[in-house]
Amino acid sequence: MVMAPIPQPWHQWPFLILFFLVLFSCESNLPCRNGVEATQRVFLYPQSPKVSSIVSKGYRTGYHFQPPKNWINDPNGPMYYNGIYHEFYQYNPNGSVWGNIVWGHSVSTDLINWIRLEPAIEGNTPSDINGCWTGSATILTGDQPVIIYTGADTEKRQVQNIVLPKNRSDPYLREWTKPKNNPLIEPVGPGLNSNQFRDPTTGWIGPDGLWRIAVGAELNGYSAALLYKSKDFMQWTRVDHPLYSSNASNMWECPDFFAVLPGKNNGLDLSAAIPNGAKHVLKMSLDSCDKYMIGVYDLKHDMFVPDTVLDDRRLWLRIDYGNYYASKSFFDSKKGRRIIWGWTNETDSTSDDVAKGWAGIHAIPRTIWLDGDGKRLLQWPIEEVESLRRNEVSHQGLELKKGDLFEIKGTDTLQADVEIDFELTSIDAADPFDPSWLLDTEKHCREADASVHGGLGPFGLVVLASDNMDEHTTVHFRVYKSEQKYMVLLCSDLRRSSLRPGLYTPAYGGFFEYDLEKEKKISLRTLIDRSAVESFGGGGRACIMARVYPAAVVDGATHMYAFNNGSSTVKVSQLKAWSMTRAQVNVRKG
């Protein structure tokens, strides 16, 4: 399809002046809260009265996971069993705010199109009467699936319970039963806070043949992943030391523990022998962010040992630098990969959520593996999402000089998948890097936004832009030189994403190290889904999930551009964009 030619800077100056002036005038926002709150709350939001709103339909996503209506938060117990993918989730069947939580349940054969089922777990026994919260699935020896989850008992203590499928011959595993010996694990022991003891992990087998799980906890005022052992997955004994603990924080939610191989995107099954050379990852949810450490699992001492110990948790690695929390991974035995899911909350108001009748989505499932140098996880949307692509638009060899803005036409800009390779013509133009920026990347993205000229960057995408550009979201790179290496900053700036008041509109950002002398180019992939903008920079080295609510989405008219506002010219060696058709997400009930 024929596209408009690349505009020359003098053709675009009135337009660009408006674009960069409105960027420059944005107010700053508080760092790293992401509009996300703790997932296991012991209070209920008051039910707001229904109000009329223009947001009732326009912002509902077309291919991200969400129930037909009401509130959703953490993904729970994802697994692949007998040809079916299962996704459980924290769900309020009675409203679009947090409360009345049960385990929703949906099934799929491709992780994209989903059939909804009746809730799998409800709080109706003494060990979960005050809440049935996050947990994990494990496939035991003999092909037996089980789920361990946190319940709030009659005393409102957080305890760990188990459920078993009532009929394993049912391909959808619709019904689950609770053994009478629940709870399996209680919050006993010195220094353990009974109200901060939750979210058990998937089980793994140690060198002694015993099963293990970790549970997030506050121990003596600090964060810990407590370690438990069992022969039969029913009788559990707490190990006398945590899997890992840190005095840099006071509570870890939703811990995850899994093995990865450097440079290989095949996943590892924790219930099988782990090959030599594998690394282990300990992921935790805190500060409204999902963070992780890479290290080794010391089998002799039954402990996780990180490669690098950082006392400042602001320097811990991030799964995602945007609105992404409570992630859960699982081994997909069908394709031999590890997949991770995360929850993305709304960042509009509670009254908006009530008016919409729904709140919360899950990010696109991502394949996750370890970079070849063993220093960082890489993430990429699962290949199945590509089945939704339609109407491909392609460009090669485009040149973007300082101030150039190139409109990408021929795709549905409300639901799109865009992949761009930016080729750098002069990496020597990179500005010097200041390590202090790592302590607050959002602040740096605000101060060095798309209106601020740099040596290399900003360059990237403008998405969900209104006709006159008074609403737009930028996803862009900046390149810096740090001693003998290059640091790349990926920003997703939401501060001009909407004219609507009362929204949380930060400038998200994250750095990653990149060998530009070898690669010479940086890739960007962005999935646009009405109110979701999900970006992957540098082949998945930095990921940013964002929620936006432009009025232009409701009007059904938005634009998308590639741009460069750096002093050095960048080339778009490859640009591909597709319209994304709507997935069948929980439309049908099974």
Curated annotation (Swiss-Prot):
Its main location: secreted. The keyword Hydrolase applies. Induction: By rice blast fungus (M.grisea) 12 hours after infection. Disulfide bonds join 445-491. It comes from the Eukaryota. GO terms for cellular component: apoplast. Glycans are attached at residues 94, 167, 247, 345, 565. Substrate binds at residues 71-74, 90, 98, 133-134, 198-199, 253, 287. It catalyses: Hydrolysis of terminal non-reducing beta-D-fructofuranoside residues in beta-D-fructofuranosides. GO terms for molecular function: beta-fructofuranosidase activity. The keyword Disulfide bond applies. Expressed in leaves. Expressed at moderate levels in roots and flowers, and weakly in seeds. One of its GO terms (biological process) is carbohydrate metabolic process. The active site is at residue 74. It is found in: Secreted, Extracellular space, Apoplast; Secreted, Cell wall. InterPro entries: ConA-like_dom_sf, Fructan_Metab_Enzymes, Glyco_hydro_32, Glyco_hydro_32_AS, Glyco_hydro_32_C, Glyco_hydro_32_N, Glyco_hydro_beta-prop_sf. Keywords: Apoplast, Cell wall, Disulfide bond, Glycoprotein, Glycosidase, Hydrolase, Secreted, Signal. Residues 1-28 form the signal peptide. It is an enzyme of class 3 (hydrolase). Gene3D superfamilies: Exo-inulinase, domain 1 (2.60.120.560), Glycosyl hydrolase domain, family 43 (2.115.10.20). Its EC number is 3.2.1.26. PROSITE patterns: GLYCOSYL_HYDROL_F32. May play a role in sucrose partitioning during seed development and in stress response. Belongs to the glycosyl hydrolase 32 family. This is Beta-fructofuranosidase, insoluble isoenzyme 4. The gene is CIN4.
